């Protein structure tokens, strides 16, 4: 049971970080290219 909880937390944290970086990068590219 504990192993599943730890794995779920690890995957959730990695997913949040991955999405944060993925969503933060796109807006920066067009902004720089527009200028």
From Swiss-Prot:
Subcellular location(s) per record: Plastid, Chloroplast thylakoid membrane
Keywords in alphabetical order: Chloroplast, Membrane, Photosynthesis, Photosystem II, Plastid, Thylakoid, Transmembrane, Transmembrane helix
Transmembrane segments: 3-23
InterPro entries, alphabetized: PSII_PsbT, PSII_PsbT_sf
GO aspect biological process, one term: photosynthesis
GO cellular component: chloroplast thylakoid membrane; photosystem II reaction center
Its membrane topology: Single-pass membrane protein
Main location as per UniProt: plastid
Domain of life the protein comes from: Eukaryota
Pfam family, any one: PsbT
Protein family membership: Belongs to the PsbT family.
Subunit structure and binding partners: PSII is composed of 1 copy each of membrane proteins PsbA, PsbB, PsbC, PsbD, PsbE, PsbF, PsbH, PsbI, PsbJ, PsbK, PsbL, PsbM, PsbT, PsbY, PsbZ, Psb30/Ycf12, at least 3 peripheral proteins of the oxygen-evolving complex and a large number of cofactors. It forms dimeric complexes.
Summary of the function given for this chain in its UniProt record: Found at the monomer-monomer interface of the photosystem II (PS II) dimer, plays a role in assembly and dimerization of PSII. PSII is a light-driven water plastoquinone oxidoreductase, using light energy to abstract electrons from H(2)O, generating a proton gradient subsequently used for ATP formation.
Protein name as it appears in the record: Photosystem II reaction center protein T
Organism encoding this protein: Cycas revoluta (Sago palm)
Organism lineage string: Eukaryota, Viridiplantae, Streptophyta, Embryophyta, Tracheophyta
């Amino acid at each position: 049971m504990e192993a599943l909880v730890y794995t779920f937390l690890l995957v959730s944290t990695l997913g949040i970080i991955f999405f944060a970086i993925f969503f933060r990068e796109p807006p920066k590219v067009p902004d720089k290219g527009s200028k």
